[in-house]
């Protein structure tokens, strides 16, 4: 567990420090090869859906909002998620981002690609599809191979877990940003509606 947490911290720090293309519809991902890969993608998919739902809920005029100078804006936080998806998958599996993405290993530049809500959604969707395709192709034998991620040696397994942690970290950041702008996460609304319905059913 300590190694996994350490890997997540390394990914988060490295992606913050590492010094408009057309986005074609990605091909459907093949079924994952092993139980770990399937379980990881299941957890990842939940955070992925919440990220896309939240991005959709935030109005365009809030995408350049940031909590303080020098801190990522709403748009930049979403773009940084996509950056992490492409960068970590490249190191973990060797799978390069599609050429049409125009990926650069430069988060400061990538995170400022655009402020357009619709384009950011396409960028996120393409990066999520890339993650699914890459992890789905990883064999069980590959999981224990050692890769070098920003100067740190770790297994492919730990690197992929850290990737999921990176998504959840910035989903949490995006939730805080949304609430600061009076936007309630869609799944939170659904949970409250379900609770009210359940309470109504219990009343005599």
Ranges and model annotations:
Residues 28-41:
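Short, low-complexity N-terminal intrinsically disordered segments enriched in polar/charged residues
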Residues 58-59:
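Membrane-proximal, proline-rich intrinsically disordered regions
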């Amino acid at each position: 567990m300590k190694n996994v947490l350490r890997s997540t911290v390394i990914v988060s720090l490295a992606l913050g420090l590492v010094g408009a293309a057309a986005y074609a519809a990605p091909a459907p991902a093949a079924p994952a090869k092993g139980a770990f890969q399937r379980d990881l993608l299941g957890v990842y998919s939940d955070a992925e859906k919440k990220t896309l739902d939240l991005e959709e809920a935030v109005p365009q005029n809030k995408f350049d909002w940031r909590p303080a100078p020098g801190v990522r804006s709403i748009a930049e936080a979403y773009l940084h998620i996509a950056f992490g998806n492409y960068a970590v998958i490249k190191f973990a599996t060797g799978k390069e981002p599609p050429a049409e993405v125009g990926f650069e290993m430069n988060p400061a530049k990538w995170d400022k690609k655009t402020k357009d809500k619709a384009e950011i959604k396409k960028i996120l969707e393409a990066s999520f599809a890339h993650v699914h395709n890459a992890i789905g192709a990883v064999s069980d034998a590959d999981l224990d191979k050692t890769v070098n991620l920003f100067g740190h040696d770790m297994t492919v397994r730990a690197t992929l877990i850290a990737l999921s942690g990176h998504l959840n970290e910035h989903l949490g950041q995006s939730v805080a940003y949304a609430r600061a702008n009076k936007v309630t996460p869609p799944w939170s609304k659904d949970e409250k509606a379900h609770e009210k319905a359940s309470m109504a059913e219990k009343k005599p």
